[in-house]
């Protein structure tokens, strides 16, 4: 049909702001870049994403979190893909969680158990390092302690 024009419109819902080489981009959950933005003029409260290859892996991370510790997604402020192999999570209370390269869901289940047993969000814990399977190293404002978590 010579006088017919077909237009396909795909709407991408902004899920996060991705930082790369000094620029900021709106991305959707599957990591597709929607548009470059000026962060000073943007007011939505979206997740910050950093690290090489992080947009492509974001959806799997969010899926793992949603399965193992669903409430955690509500407190995520920033995620960073470290050295192309593992994630750091920063929560809205500035708590840093270091995930391992493998068995992320199990580590997130352990984190959930720690949150349920301790008042982590209200404590002076500033970092939880889960990079060693079955263990959580806690860093507090006035020193460092270790807390063992049995596998679930």
Could you describe each region identified by the protein language model?
Residues 1-152:
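Charged, solvent-exposed interaction patches on well-folded alpha/beta domains
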């Amino acid at each position: 049909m010579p006088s017919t024009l077909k237009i396909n419109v795909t709407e991408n819902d902004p899920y996060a702001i991705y930082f790369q080489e000094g620029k900021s981009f709106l991305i959707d959950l599957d990591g597709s870049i929607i548009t470059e933005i000026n962060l000073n003029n943007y007011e939505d409260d979206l997740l910050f994403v950093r690290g090489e290859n992080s947009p492509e892996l974001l959806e799997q991370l969010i899926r793992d979190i949603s399965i193992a510790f669903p409430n955690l997604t509500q407190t995520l402020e920033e995620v960073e893909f470290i050295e192309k192999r593992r994630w750091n999570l920063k929560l809205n209370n500035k708590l840093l969680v270091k995930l391992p390269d493998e068995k992320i869901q199990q580590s997130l289940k352990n984190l959930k158990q720690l949150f349920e047993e301790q008042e982590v969000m209200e404590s002076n814990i500033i970092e939880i390092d889960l990079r060693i399977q079955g263990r959580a190293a806690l860093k507090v404002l006035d020193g460092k302690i270790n807390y063992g978590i049995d596998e679930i």
